Amino acid sequence: MEEAHNMREISIREIVVNHAVLSSCIDKCGDCFASEAARIKFDNDIEAIFELKRKRNAVILAHNYQTPEIFHGVADIVGDSLALARKAIDVDADVIVLAGVHFMAETAKLLNPEKTVLIPDREAGCSLAESITPEDVALLRQAHPGIPIVTYVNTSAAVKAASDICCTSGNAKKVVEALGVPKVLMIPDEYLARNVAKETEVQIISWHGHCEVHELFSASDILQLRENHPGVTVLAHPECPPDVVAAADFAGSTAAMSDYVTTKQPKRVVLLTECSMSDNIAVHHPDVEFISSCNLCPHMKRITLANIRTALEENRHEVTVDAKIADPARRAVERMLAI
Protein backbone atom coordinates (compact mmCIF):
# COMPACT_ATOMS: atom_id res chain seq x y z
CA MET A 1 0.00 0.00 0.00
CA GLU A 2 1.35 3.36 -0.94
CA GLU A 3 -0.68 6.50 -0.72
CA ALA A 4 -0.18 10.24 -0.33
CA HIS A 5 -2.48 12.39 1.75
CA ASN A 6 -2.98 16.13 1.34
CA MET A 7 -5.24 16.88 4.28
CA ARG A 8 -7.00 20.19 4.86
CA GLU A 9 -6.62 21.70 8.31
CA ILE A 10 -9.94 20.43 9.61
CA SER A 11 -10.97 18.56 12.71
CA ILE A 12 -9.48 15.14 12.08
CA ARG A 13 -11.58 13.90 14.98
CA GLU A 14 -14.55 14.05 12.59
CA ILE A 15 -12.75 11.56 10.35
CA VAL A 16 -11.26 9.33 13.02
CA VAL A 17 -13.72 9.33 15.89
CA ASN A 18 -17.04 9.55 14.09
CA HIS A 19 -16.31 7.03 11.34
CA ALA A 20 -18.18 3.85 12.23
CA VAL A 21 -15.61 1.45 10.75
CA LEU A 22 -12.94 2.82 13.09
CA SER A 23 -15.02 2.37 16.24
CA SER A 24 -12.97 -0.65 17.28
CA CYS A 25 -9.82 1.45 17.11
CA ILE A 26 -11.34 4.16 19.27
CA ASP A 27 -12.42 1.50 21.75
CA LYS A 28 -8.79 0.34 21.96
CA CYS A 29 -7.84 3.94 22.59
CA GLY A 30 -9.08 3.56 26.15
CA ASP A 31 -9.50 6.86 27.93
CA CYS A 32 -7.80 9.08 25.35
CA PHE A 33 -11.17 10.72 24.59
CA ALA A 34 -12.61 10.35 28.07
CA SER A 35 -12.72 14.09 28.73
CA GLU A 36 -13.25 17.28 26.83
CA ALA A 37 -9.69 18.28 27.71
CA ALA A 38 -8.41 15.13 25.99
CA ARG A 39 -10.49 15.93 22.91
CA ILE A 40 -9.15 19.48 22.81
CA LYS A 41 -5.56 18.24 23.12
CA PHE A 42 -6.17 15.78 20.30
CA ASP A 43 -7.34 18.55 17.97
CA ASN A 44 -4.56 20.88 19.11
CA ASP A 45 -1.90 18.25 18.40
CA ILE A 46 -3.30 17.70 14.90
CA GLU A 47 -3.38 21.41 14.12
CA ALA A 48 0.10 21.97 15.57
CA ILE A 49 1.57 19.11 13.52
CA PHE A 50 0.18 20.54 10.29
CA GLU A 51 1.59 23.97 11.11
CA LEU A 52 4.98 22.53 12.09
CA LYS A 53 5.14 20.51 8.87
CA ARG A 54 4.51 23.69 6.92
CA LYS A 55 7.08 25.75 8.83
CA ARG A 56 9.82 23.10 8.72
CA ASN A 57 9.11 21.75 5.23
CA ALA A 58 8.60 18.35 6.83
CA VAL A 59 6.83 15.18 5.76
CA ILE A 60 5.58 12.29 7.85
CA LEU A 61 6.12 8.74 6.61
CA ALA A 62 3.87 6.30 8.47
CA HIS A 63 3.89 2.52 8.44
CA ASN A 64 0.65 0.59 7.98
CA TYR A 65 0.77 -0.41 11.67
CA GLN A 66 0.39 3.14 12.93
CA THR A 67 -2.87 4.07 14.64
CA PRO A 68 -5.57 5.65 12.44
CA GLU A 69 -5.21 9.16 13.86
CA ILE A 70 -1.61 9.10 12.61
CA PHE A 71 -2.18 7.03 9.47
CA HIS A 72 -5.24 8.95 8.26
CA GLY A 73 -4.78 12.16 10.20
CA VAL A 74 -1.25 13.51 9.82
CA ALA A 75 0.76 11.17 7.55
CA ASP A 76 1.81 12.42 4.13
CA ILE A 77 2.96 9.01 2.87
CA VAL A 78 1.78 5.65 4.18
CA GLY A 79 2.64 2.10 3.30
CA ASP A 80 4.58 -1.03 4.12
CA SER A 81 8.36 -1.15 4.54
CA LEU A 82 9.01 -1.48 0.81
CA ALA A 83 6.68 1.37 -0.13
CA LEU A 84 8.18 3.66 2.50
CA ALA A 85 11.71 2.84 1.33
CA ARG A 86 10.82 3.60 -2.29
CA LYS A 87 8.97 6.81 -1.47
CA ALA A 88 11.73 8.01 0.86
CA ILE A 89 14.01 8.42 -2.16
CA ASP A 90 11.69 10.95 -3.77
CA VAL A 91 10.73 12.95 -0.69
CA ASP A 92 10.92 16.69 -1.38
CA ALA A 93 11.38 18.00 2.14
CA ASP A 94 14.03 19.14 4.57
CA VAL A 95 12.77 16.98 7.43
CA ILE A 96 11.41 13.43 7.46
CA VAL A 97 9.50 12.18 10.50
CA LEU A 98 9.31 8.40 10.48
CA ALA A 99 6.18 7.19 12.26
CA GLY A 100 7.37 3.63 12.66
CA VAL A 101 10.24 1.79 14.28
CA HIS A 102 13.94 2.56 14.38
CA PHE A 103 15.16 0.41 11.48
CA MET A 104 12.69 2.20 9.21
CA ALA A 105 14.05 5.58 10.28
CA GLU A 106 17.59 4.33 9.64
CA THR A 107 16.57 3.20 6.16
CA ALA A 108 15.06 6.61 5.44
CA LYS A 109 18.32 8.21 6.57
CA LEU A 110 20.40 5.88 4.41
CA LEU A 111 18.40 6.94 1.37
CA ASN A 112 18.36 10.62 2.37
CA PRO A 113 21.75 11.29 3.97
CA GLU A 114 21.44 15.05 3.49
CA LYS A 115 18.02 15.32 5.15
CA THR A 116 17.09 15.48 8.81
CA VAL A 117 15.34 12.26 9.81
CA LEU A 118 13.47 12.14 13.11
CA ILE A 119 11.90 9.28 15.02
CA PRO A 120 9.40 10.40 17.68
CA ASP A 121 10.46 7.71 20.17
CA ARG A 122 14.02 6.39 20.07
CA GLU A 123 12.94 3.25 21.97
CA ALA A 124 10.63 2.12 19.15
CA GLY A 125 12.57 -1.03 18.32
CA CYS A 126 11.84 -4.39 16.70
CA SER A 127 12.23 -7.95 17.96
CA LEU A 128 13.55 -9.05 14.57
CA ALA A 129 16.14 -6.27 14.43
CA GLU A 130 17.29 -7.21 17.91
CA SER A 131 17.63 -10.90 17.03
CA ILE A 132 20.86 -10.56 15.04
CA THR A 133 24.10 -8.57 15.16
CA PRO A 134 26.86 -7.79 12.64
CA GLU A 135 29.02 -10.30 14.50
CA ASP A 136 26.40 -12.97 13.89
CA VAL A 137 26.47 -12.14 10.17
CA ALA A 138 30.26 -12.45 10.12
CA LEU A 139 30.03 -15.91 11.70
CA LEU A 140 27.42 -16.93 9.13
CA ARG A 141 29.77 -15.88 6.32
CA GLN A 142 32.52 -18.00 7.83
CA ALA A 143 30.20 -20.98 8.14
CA HIS A 144 28.77 -20.58 4.62
CA PRO A 145 31.52 -19.08 2.44
CA GLY A 146 30.41 -17.76 -0.91
CA ILE A 147 26.69 -17.90 -0.08
CA PRO A 148 24.90 -14.55 -0.62
CA ILE A 149 23.25 -13.05 2.43
CA VAL A 150 19.74 -11.69 1.88
CA THR A 151 18.76 -9.53 4.82
CA TYR A 152 15.24 -8.53 5.77
CA VAL A 153 14.89 -4.76 6.11
CA ASN A 154 13.77 -5.35 9.69
CA THR A 155 17.40 -5.09 10.79
CA SER A 156 19.85 -2.45 11.95
CA ALA A 157 21.94 -0.48 9.49
CA ALA A 158 25.00 -2.30 10.84
CA VAL A 159 23.52 -5.69 9.91
CA LYS A 160 22.50 -4.39 6.49
CA ALA A 161 26.07 -3.19 5.97
CA ALA A 162 27.35 -6.71 6.61
CA SER A 163 24.92 -8.18 4.07
CA ASP A 164 24.77 -8.45 0.29
CA ILE A 165 21.22 -7.32 -0.41
CA CYS A 166 18.04 -6.49 1.47
CA CYS A 167 14.48 -7.70 1.00
CA THR A 168 11.03 -7.05 2.42
CA SER A 169 8.12 -9.39 2.98
CA GLY A 170 6.69 -8.02 -0.25
CA ASN A 171 9.65 -8.84 -2.50
CA ALA A 172 11.62 -11.59 -0.72
CA LYS A 173 10.94 -14.30 -3.31
CA LYS A 174 11.76 -11.93 -6.16
CA VAL A 175 15.04 -10.88 -4.55
CA VAL A 176 16.11 -14.46 -3.80
CA GLU A 177 15.46 -15.59 -7.37
CA ALA A 178 17.03 -12.48 -8.92
CA LEU A 179 20.42 -13.47 -7.47
CA GLY A 180 20.58 -16.44 -9.83
CA VAL A 181 22.24 -18.77 -7.34
CA PRO A 182 21.15 -22.18 -5.99
CA LYS A 183 21.51 -21.29 -2.32
CA VAL A 184 21.17 -18.17 -0.14
CA LEU A 185 21.19 -17.19 3.49
CA MET A 186 18.05 -15.30 4.51
CA ILE A 187 18.18 -13.46 7.82
CA PRO A 188 16.92 -12.88 10.43
CA ASP A 189 13.27 -14.02 10.17
CA GLU A 190 13.09 -17.82 10.27
CA TYR A 191 9.43 -17.99 9.32
CA LEU A 192 9.73 -15.62 6.38
CA ALA A 193 12.66 -17.68 5.10
CA ARG A 194 10.77 -20.96 5.49
CA ASN A 195 7.68 -19.56 3.81
CA VAL A 196 9.69 -18.21 0.87
CA ALA A 197 11.53 -21.54 0.59
CA LYS A 198 8.21 -23.23 -0.18
CA GLU A 199 7.71 -20.92 -3.16
CA THR A 200 11.10 -21.22 -4.83
CA GLU A 201 13.62 -23.83 -5.89
CA VAL A 202 16.42 -21.80 -4.30
CA GLN A 203 17.71 -23.46 -1.15
CA ILE A 204 17.38 -21.09 1.79
CA ILE A 205 19.40 -21.22 4.99
CA SER A 206 17.58 -19.36 7.76
CA TRP A 207 18.35 -17.65 11.07
CA HIS A 208 16.27 -17.98 14.26
CA GLY A 209 14.71 -14.53 14.56
CA HIS A 210 10.95 -14.13 14.98
CA CYS A 211 8.50 -11.24 14.96
CA GLU A 212 6.93 -11.05 18.41
CA VAL A 213 3.60 -10.06 16.85
CA HIS A 214 3.29 -12.69 14.14
CA GLU A 215 4.83 -15.66 15.95
CA LEU A 216 1.82 -15.66 18.31
CA PHE A 217 -0.63 -16.76 15.62
CA SER A 218 -1.34 -20.49 15.30
CA ALA A 219 -3.11 -22.82 12.90
CA SER A 220 -5.60 -23.57 15.68
CA ASP A 221 -6.48 -19.86 15.70
CA ILE A 222 -7.53 -20.19 12.07
CA LEU A 223 -9.63 -23.28 12.78
CA GLN A 224 -11.40 -21.41 15.56
CA LEU A 225 -11.95 -18.38 13.35
CA ARG A 226 -13.50 -20.49 10.60
CA GLU A 227 -15.75 -22.20 13.14
CA ASN A 228 -16.88 -18.92 14.71
CA HIS A 229 -17.16 -16.99 11.45
CA PRO A 230 -18.25 -19.30 8.61
CA GLY A 231 -17.06 -18.16 5.22
CA VAL A 232 -14.37 -15.86 6.60
CA THR A 233 -11.37 -15.21 4.35
CA VAL A 234 -8.10 -15.49 6.28
CA LEU A 235 -5.10 -13.39 5.25
CA ALA A 236 -1.75 -14.06 6.93
CA HIS A 237 1.53 -12.19 6.98
CA PRO A 238 4.57 -14.25 5.85
CA GLU A 239 6.23 -13.56 9.21
CA CYS A 240 3.67 -16.00 10.65
CA PRO A 241 4.68 -19.63 11.26
CA PRO A 242 4.52 -21.80 8.11
CA ASP A 243 1.55 -23.85 9.36
CA VAL A 244 -0.41 -20.60 9.76
CA VAL A 245 0.48 -19.50 6.24
CA ALA A 246 -0.51 -22.93 4.91
CA ALA A 247 -3.89 -22.77 6.64
CA ALA A 248 -4.68 -19.24 5.43
CA ASP A 249 -6.46 -18.37 2.19
CA PHE A 250 -3.75 -15.88 1.24
CA ALA A 251 -0.36 -14.83 2.58
CA GLY A 252 1.41 -11.59 1.77
CA SER A 253 2.86 -8.34 2.99
CA THR A 254 0.61 -5.66 4.44
CA ALA A 255 0.51 -4.02 1.01
CA ALA A 256 -0.50 -7.33 -0.57
CA MET A 257 -3.20 -7.81 2.06
CA SER A 258 -4.61 -4.38 1.31
CA ASP A 259 -4.56 -5.09 -2.42
CA TYR A 260 -6.31 -8.42 -1.84
CA VAL A 261 -9.17 -6.79 0.03
CA THR A 262 -9.47 -4.10 -2.65
CA THR A 263 -9.55 -6.50 -5.59
CA LYS A 264 -11.37 -9.50 -4.09
CA GLN A 265 -13.81 -7.61 -1.82
CA PRO A 266 -14.43 -10.54 0.53
CA LYS A 267 -17.64 -10.28 2.52
CA ARG A 268 -15.86 -11.19 5.73
CA VAL A 269 -12.10 -11.12 6.31
CA VAL A 270 -9.55 -11.46 9.07
CA LEU A 271 -5.98 -10.17 8.86
CA LEU A 272 -3.44 -12.11 10.90
CA THR A 273 -1.09 -9.24 11.54
CA GLU A 274 -0.83 -6.10 13.69
CA CYS A 275 -4.18 -4.68 14.83
CA SER A 276 -3.95 -1.23 13.24
CA MET A 277 -3.67 -2.75 9.77
CA SER A 278 -7.34 -3.74 9.76
CA ASP A 279 -8.40 -0.45 11.33
CA ASN A 280 -6.58 1.54 8.68
CA ILE A 281 -7.87 -0.22 5.59
CA ALA A 282 -11.40 -0.75 6.90
CA VAL A 283 -12.17 2.93 6.31
CA HIS A 284 -11.89 2.31 2.56
CA HIS A 285 -14.07 -0.83 2.60
CA PRO A 286 -17.32 -0.16 4.47
CA ASP A 287 -18.99 -3.19 2.86
CA VAL A 288 -16.36 -5.63 4.12
CA GLU A 289 -16.73 -7.09 7.61
CA PHE A 290 -13.34 -7.12 9.34
CA ILE A 291 -13.13 -9.78 12.04
CA SER A 292 -10.86 -8.82 14.90
CA SER A 293 -8.08 -11.32 15.51
CA CYS A 294 -4.81 -9.47 15.81
CA ASN A 295 -1.84 -8.72 18.03
CA LEU A 296 -0.56 -5.30 19.04
CA CYS A 297 3.04 -4.28 18.35
CA PRO A 298 4.24 -2.46 21.47
CA HIS A 299 7.04 -0.82 19.49
CA MET A 300 4.80 0.68 16.81
CA LYS A 301 2.44 1.89 19.51
CA ARG A 302 5.19 4.00 21.07
CA ILE A 303 4.57 6.52 18.29
CA THR A 304 1.81 9.01 19.17
CA LEU A 305 0.46 12.34 17.99
CA ALA A 306 2.03 13.94 21.04
CA ASN A 307 5.57 12.70 20.39
CA ILE A 308 5.29 13.43 16.66
CA ARG A 309 4.47 17.00 17.63
CA THR A 310 7.38 17.10 20.08
CA ALA A 311 9.75 15.66 17.47
CA LEU A 312 8.91 18.51 15.10
CA GLU A 313 8.98 21.18 17.81
CA GLU A 314 12.27 20.12 19.39
CA ASN A 315 14.01 18.26 16.53
CA ARG A 316 13.73 15.08 18.58
CA HIS A 317 15.10 12.40 18.03
CA GLU A 318 17.44 12.82 15.07
CA VAL A 319 18.58 9.58 13.44
CA THR A 320 22.19 9.23 12.36
CA VAL A 321 24.09 6.37 10.77
CA ASP A 322 27.82 5.93 11.29
CA ALA A 323 29.73 6.83 8.13
CA LYS A 324 31.63 3.53 8.19
CA ILE A 325 28.45 1.50 7.78
CA ALA A 326 26.24 3.95 5.89
CA ASP A 327 27.66 3.29 2.41
CA PRO A 328 27.58 -0.54 2.50
CA ALA A 329 24.16 -0.50 4.18
CA ARG A 330 22.86 1.89 1.53
CA ARG A 331 24.19 -0.35 -1.24
CA ALA A 332 22.34 -3.35 0.21
CA VAL A 333 19.08 -1.37 0.22
CA GLU A 334 19.66 0.11 -3.23
CA ARG A 335 20.37 -3.32 -4.72
CA MET A 336 16.96 -4.40 -3.47
CA LEU A 337 15.23 -1.32 -4.87
CA ALA A 338 16.87 -1.88 -8.25
CA ILE A 339 15.16 -5.27 -8.64
From Swiss-Prot:
Q: Which NCBIfam families does the record associate with it?
A: nadA, PRK09375.1-2, PRK09375.1-4
- Keyword field: 4Fe-4S, Cytoplasm, Iron, Iron-sulfur, Metal-binding, Pyridine nucleotide biosynthesis, Transferase
- Localisation per UniProt entry: Cytoplasm
- Provide a Gene Ontology MF annotation, just one: 4 iron, 4 sulfur cluster binding
Q: Which PANTHER family match?
A: QUINOLINATE SYNTHASE, CHLOROPLASTIC (PTHR30573:SF0), QUINOLINATE SYNTHETASE A (PTHR30573)
EC numbers listed for it are 2.5.1.72
Under HAMAP family, the record lists: NadA_type2
| Necessary cofactors | [4Fe-4S] cluster
Cofactor info, note text: Binds 1 [4Fe-4S] cluster per subunit.
Please, which domain of life does this record's source organism belong to? Bacteria
Q: Which residues bind iminosuccinate?
A: H63, S81, Y152, V153, N154, S169, H237, P238, E239, T254
Q: Which gene encodes it?
A: nadA
Q: Where does [4Fe-4S] cluster bind?
A: C126, C211, C297
Top EC class, one word: transferase
What is the official name of this protein in its record?
A: Quinolinate synthase
- GO CC terms, sorted: cytosol
Gene Ontology terms: biological process: 'de novo' NAD biosynthetic process from L-aspartate
Its family remark reads: Belongs to the quinolinate synthase family. Type 2 subfamily.
Catalytic reaction annotation: iminosuccinate + dihydroxyacetone phosphate = quinolinate + phosphate + 2 H2O + H(+)
Which pathway, metabolic or otherwise, does it act in? Cofactor biosynthesis; NAD(+) biosynthesis; quinolinate from iminoaspartate: step 1/1
